[in-house]
Amino acid sequence: SVADPNVVLNTAVAEALDQICEKLADVDKKDLEEEAMKLVKKLLKKHRRIIFNGNGYTDEWVAEAEKRGLYNLKSLPEAMPQIKAKKNKELFEKHHVFTEIEIDSRYEIYLENYSKTIRIEALTMLEMVKKDFTDGLMAYETALTDTAIQKKQVLADAKCTLETSILTKLDAASEAIGLAVEKLEKDLAETQKITDSLALATAYHDTILADMDALRAPVDAAEEMIPETYLPYPTYSKLLF
């Protein structure tokens, strides 16, 4: 939800305005505009490093942010410890946004939701591959094998080059799928032993998501070779077009 980043941004803006208000509170009215401009220049000079006018969606900004010493927290497990940092807790409490207990509870809830969501996705992926996709894969392999055998029976010197080529690729994909399924299942079982919420979320990010990508690759490769009639669910092209 955009509500969460907006809470953080609005709290940060409130703190900045509060600091500005404190600095200008005792300034004489006739000098207010001049002092305000001086303060703006000072703040701009101090915080210019966060201003970037290039393309923020490319690696250009990533490299520039690193050069400027700015955070680049790419995942929730990397980012969540920041919410518990002392200065951030004090900021939320100062503006009556969250109490320390509320911050700690949100920390645990966000991490738990993150881990549970990835677990559900991983289990769903395993079910789709094991119960549905592999059936279609093996059925098509069987059909190709039967076709090659029948051609050989009719034409003894038939090379069956196409069937052999596809079968070779499907066999390699099938082997990779089997190994990837085993690894994902094994690593999912290992996550059940982790009790710390941050360590668990980190394991789901670093290991389970990587396992899912590793499983998807051979499935996608095989899917490109399998006719739609053998697939138990619509392909991307069918869903999109």
Per-segment meaning from a language model:
Residues 40-44:
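Single-stranded nucleic-acid nicking/binding segments centered on His-rich, glycine/basic loops
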Residues 1-36:
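An acidic, glycine-/histidine-flanked metal-binding catalytic module
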Residues 46-241:
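C-terminal amphipathic alpha-helical interaction region
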